[in-house]
Every structure is written in C-alpha cells, then in structure tokens.
Amino acid sequence: MAHLVWQDDLNTGIQVIDNQHKRIVEMINLLHDAQQGKEHAAIAEVIEELVDYTLSHFAFEETLMEDAGYQFSRAHKKIHELFIRRVSEYRVRFQAGEDVGDELKGLLSRWLFNHIRNDDAGYVDAVRHSMSELVKDKSEGGWLSRSMKRFFG
C-alpha cells in the first residue's frame, strides 16, 4: 500500500476538523513508513499515537455535534465506538506479536475516507451553523454583554 493522499472531496469546510483528519492521514502514512523499517518498537509507537489521537479527535467531533444539536450525534458516536473496538482488537493482536500492519492500514484508510465522505458529511451543516452563531454571538459582545445592554442600557 502506498502513502495515502488527501483529496479535496474529503474537506468538510470545518478547518479544525479537516486539519485533524489530515493529521490522521499523516499518521497512517507514518505507520506505513514504520512498517517498512520493520522495527517493532517504532510500529508500536505509531499505533499507540494513532489510536490516542483518533480517540481525542472523536471526542472533539462528538462535542461539536452535541453543541450544535445535531440530531444524529448519538448514532455517530456509536459508529465511533464500534470503530474504536475494532482498532483496539488490532492493537491487542499486535501486542501479542501478530503482524497486523497491512490489515490495520487497509482498515484505517478505507474506514477513514468512507467515514468522512458519508458519516461526517451529515453533521457539517449543523456544526457550521452552530460555529457561525458562536462567532456572531462573540462579535455582538456575547450573551452577557447583550443582556447587560438590554437591562441597563
């Protein structure tokens, strides 16, 4: 498997999410590179970093969806949980000495691109709207500032 290449159709238009997705792609490519060196410790380090980063990305993404009131946030979170379970199984197999690198890279790349194009695309409008409301709210002085003006002139 060659290095993954970011494609424009993967952009959600939410810069912070796109940057996180790109970082995950970079990490999958690092896994590929570590595998070429055949150093177990280097591969283990990349797998751990990739899993940790993905978990934090999921938590961030889920918070954005919940804050935006996205109606399918619970279902989306379930998808994340199932994926985490699958990747955790690969981690255990790797720690037991099994060579799961190619299999794991294939799963990660297929799942990530499919997930971004299909599942993540569903929340984009709600999150973008929520984020624009936050920016608007901040530019208008925020909730407290508006309330103070309304009550005290």
UniProtKB/Swiss-Prot annotation:
- Gene Ontology MF annotations: iron ion binding; oxygen carrier activity
**PROSITE patterns in the cross-refs:** HEMERYTHRINS
Gene3D superfamilies in alphabetical order: Hemerythrin-like (1.20.120.50)
Which annotated residues bind Fe cation 2?
A: 61, 76, 80, 115, 120
Q: Which Pfam families match?
A: Hemerythrin
* Binding locations of Fe cation 1: 21, 57, 61, 120
Cross-referenced InterPro entries: Bacteriohemerythrin-like, Haemerythrin_Fe_BS, Hemerythrin, Hemerythrin-like, Hemerythrin-like_sf, Hemerythrin_metal-bd
Q: Which HAMAP family match?
A: Hemerythrin
Q: Oligomeric state and partners?
A: Monomer.
Function in brief = Oxygen-binding protein. May be involved in a storage mechanism or for delivery to oxygen-requiring enzymes. The oxygen-binding site contains two iron atoms.
Q: Which family does it belong to?
A: Belongs to the hemerythrin family.
Protein name per Swiss-Prot or TrEMBL: Bacteriohemerythrin
Question: Where does this protein come from, organism-wise?
Answer: Pseudomonas paraeruginosa (strain DSM 24068 / PA7)
